[in-house]
Amino acid sequence: MRWLAMALVSCLAGCPAFAQSGPSFDCAKASNAVERTICKDPELAKADRDMAATYTALAGKLSGPAKDDVVKDQARWIGDRNRGCGADTDGIAPCLKKRYAARTANLRAFADGPYPFISEQSLARSGKLGKITYSYDIGYPRFDGTTADFTAINARFANAAQKAAADATPKGASGVDREQGWTYEQGFRVYRPSAHAVTVAVDFYGYSGGAHGYGATDCTLVDLRTGKAVGPQDAFVSGDDWLKTMVQLVGADLKKQFVDKPGFDEALEPKNLAKLLREPGHYCWQANRLELILNAYEVGPYVSGPFEVDVPYERLKPLLRADGPVALNP
């Protein structure tokens, strides 16, 4: 890993411009199945080139601890990419496409404001117990900054990842006498709703037997000033006006969506919707809008999948706290 970090630093000092048709590295020196797959796929080559350019632009404007952090994180990401996608049972190319999309988006988010010191950690394993073949590939964030105490939020993400890994590993009572294929994949994206807060959106999908798999998106708003996870009640002004407004906006939008895909009518009842909208995991605060994500079974059947409601910040401006984590510029 040390040699890779040094290579990245050297590249920042004077790498030639990336080839316009190939990836950011020399395909003649491709040393593993992941790199060879990238070299053979023009779409992946472009994804690698774009990601590398985004990384180089970010690292080039950083210095000191921030630059050290992003260089080490990039080296770690490349190593995790090789291990995770190299062992992916669904194929290397699909794994790479997802990883590159998320990494490029996160690097752009890191560049949008003060560097947030967020590194990507991973848990990965594959094996077999009885007749069950299983694998998991889990990415989760760690806040490495020193401006606040991030101990609690880091433990929260790490513990959730460890629990997911344990749940994705078959046990003796898991029906090991039947042929099964268990998988679990998890990644995350970072959004910047303001200069002093980030949203971490964790996406996961798994299958461990049964009629179908399971998946969801869970969002966490982190106030970088305090190092704490905060909920909608911390972003909106005090009182219940924000909740009443959200119930009206979300209820009206869902009613329209239910025309095209089935939903639970009882979910639209104000009391039920209010209870759901108090839960912070649905609130994916982004750069210019709030995205409400309601996962399968929460307001509709599994076949309908998740429901999403976008709310521009202009509609919420009177309700947002001036000193809150999502304060808008005047």
Locate the predicted segments by residue:
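N-terminal signal peptide c-region/cleavage motif recognized by signal peptidases
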Residues: 14-19
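Short amphipathic alpha-helical heptad-repeat segments
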Residues: 44-48, 66-73
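Histidine-centered, metal-coordinating catalytic motifs and their short helical/loop contexts
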Residues: 68-86
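Compositionally biased intrinsically disordered regions enriched in Thr/Gly
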Residues: 31-48, 53-60, 83-330
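Generic anion/oxyanion-binding catalytic loop in active/binding sites
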Residues: 28, 40, 66
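Secreted, propeptide-processed cysteine-rich mini-domains
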Residues: 22-34
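Sec-dependent N-terminal signal peptides
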Residues: 3-13
